[in-house]
Curated annotation (Swiss-Prot):
Pfam families: Ets, Ets1_N_flank, SAM_PNT
Organism from which the protein derives: Xenopus laevis
One annotated GO biological process: cell differentiation
Residue ranges the UniProt entry marks as DNA-binding: 366-446
Subcellular location: Nucleus
Domain of life per record: Eukaryota
Name under which the protein is recorded: Protein c-ets-2-A
Start and end residues of each PNT domain: 85-170
Amino acid sequence: MTEFGIRNMDQVAPVYNGHRAMLKRQLAFDNVSVPTSLYSGLFSAYEEEQAVPTGLDSYSHDSSSCELPLLTPCSKAVMSQALKNTFNGFAKKRFRLGILSNPWLWDENNVFQWLWWAAKEFSLQNVNFQKFLMNGHELCSLGKERFLALAPDFVGDILWEHLEEMMKEHQEKAQEPYIDHSNQDSINHWMNADSLNFTTDPLQCGAQVHNYPKNGMFNDMCSVPTGQTLLQPKQEFQQYPSSCLKSRAVNYSPASQDFARSNMNALLNSLNSGKLRDYDSGDSGTESFESTESLLQSWTSQSSLVDMQRVPSYDGFEEDGSQALCLNKPPMSFKDYIQDRCEPAELGKPVIPASILAGFTGSGPIQLWQFLLELLTDKSCQSFISWTGDGWEFKLTDPDEVARRWGKRKNKPKMNYEKLSRGLRYYYDKNIIHKTSGKRYVYRFVCDLHNLLGYTPDELHAMLGVQPDTDE
């Protein structure tokens, strides 16, 4: 062999892959214990040689590294706060629509309004509202499992959490001790109640009750001696036994119940058939819930008493609730209610005490319209507020004095007529009180006070010695 050939061999040898291939195959043989897997070992070795590096060789294949990260306390807090903010959206609606904070005492209308809000808030489709044609007591008595079976998919847990939170919140309030007055301003500010000036009056909620003997359920439940405070402040309806709640019928006559149910059924049928889509607002940032509020009010305003029940109140429990919820009796007027209690109007006392009226209507704390009726039926107040002699029309002769007394009743020393008038304006849309056009400080009750109170305007005028007002 020539020198040229030897040099040529030296040049070619380094690129000859035969020996390396033999080592690869030998490696395959050494790694295979079963003769039948000869070719599979060869192919695996070949694939190993041809493998393209991916940069993932150092990545751990431990199963624990593939799990989703657990929720940290921080992320849980963020989610909880987000839900809480969403729930607060309903709280604002509840105050505006006059829905009680205690879901145990909701009627069918309140339950529907809550579900309607949830459907819009969570963009729920094809919600069968007929499944929830029940009052608040029935709703809260379902329990979580039965509730989830009726609720829409995916959001049942959230809705139940919201309902449960409202129940717990009210239960905690009912068990709270006396609340320091210094906390009232911050609470009222959070609830944005200053615009309506329906605020907590701890003194009034626990007012002296010498003049009104307590009989019935509340006397047994509370066992409060005469002359002591009946209930603690910042306290609304408590969770009473189901027997008392189911018999709660003083607020509605059978006819109005049937009418409300028939209207609600018609509304639910329209909702389920998609006929209310025209009511939805197409403008961004405008909630369609508000666009249907007029429709909801059209069938909740069939009874003036129902309307009065819807007026929001941010105070505590009414002074007298002994007969407001014990109600195996047929619906009656306030006049019959007083006579049934053997409490005739005392000389020098208002014919319609606001505390007893609040207990009769079941509205909870004393509301502005009830307070005005108390002043109007008290002869000693005729110097600053009185009937004009024209039906249910009345005049604030001294509006500042009326505002001052309302502020004293509600523990709001800074109350003035401007703030009081904002509360009065709220009643306009509810068809409870209207402003008389062309007359200053003159208003008129436009709801059905005759059926509610059992008195005609002329009867009250005669009892109070009211003469027709000829000044204007």
